[in-house]
């Protein structure tokens, strides 16, 4: 948005249906929202030693998921409003450079060609698929799957010690996974 604030014609290419990239849509923001739930559960348990007993938490996964989505929607909606207010054009899809000053975006509605003088690349990330793991197995989740919070398995193994993996381990443990 800073480019638009400085008077430059600005276009954002976004692969998700809402602005915010990986962090806001399928990364740090949904993870932090779920981590907040885990923290509240753990703090409630810890208060027992101070004489305040809440009992075992009863979790409604559907309501937790809905709340997490509400957090995401509120923030992505805010970004959409900021983009509109600054007259930033948003093109949804995946972009690839086709020339020194040309980007081709493949989206749901076909291809869009964008000509530009300057480009800022903020490509985000995506989960890696390890070749020795059967990804078609519904028990195998990547971080995006874990953030969807479809179920709380009885037991969960987290491979990888990145921040999202650590946070998801914390969340699922607080929700009852071993």
What are these regions (language model features)?
Residues 150-178:
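Rossmann-like NAD(P)H-binding beta-loop-alpha module
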């Amino acid at each position: 948005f800073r480019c638009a604030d400085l008077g430059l014609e600005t276009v954002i290419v976004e692969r998700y249906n809402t602005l915010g990239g990986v962090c806001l849509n399928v990364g740090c923001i949904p993870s932090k929202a779920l981590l907040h739930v885990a923290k509240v559960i753990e703090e409630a348990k810890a208060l027992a030693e101070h004489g305040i007993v809440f009992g075992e938490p009863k979790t409604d996964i559907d309501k937790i998921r809905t709340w997490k989505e509400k957090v995401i929607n509120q923030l992505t909606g805010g970004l959409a409003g900021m983009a509109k207010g600054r007259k930033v054009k948003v093109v949804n899809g995946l972009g690839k450079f086709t020339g020194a000053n040309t980007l081709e975006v493949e989206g749901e509605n076909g291809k869009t060609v964008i000509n530009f003088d300057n480009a800022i690349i903020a490509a985000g990330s995506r989960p890696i698929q390890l070749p020795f793991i059967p990804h078609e197995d519904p028990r195998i989740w990547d971080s995006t799957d874990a953030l969807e919070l479809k179920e709380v398995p009885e037991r969960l193994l987290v491979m990888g010690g990145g921040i999202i993996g650590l946070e998801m381990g914390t969340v699922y443990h607080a929700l009852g996974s071993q």
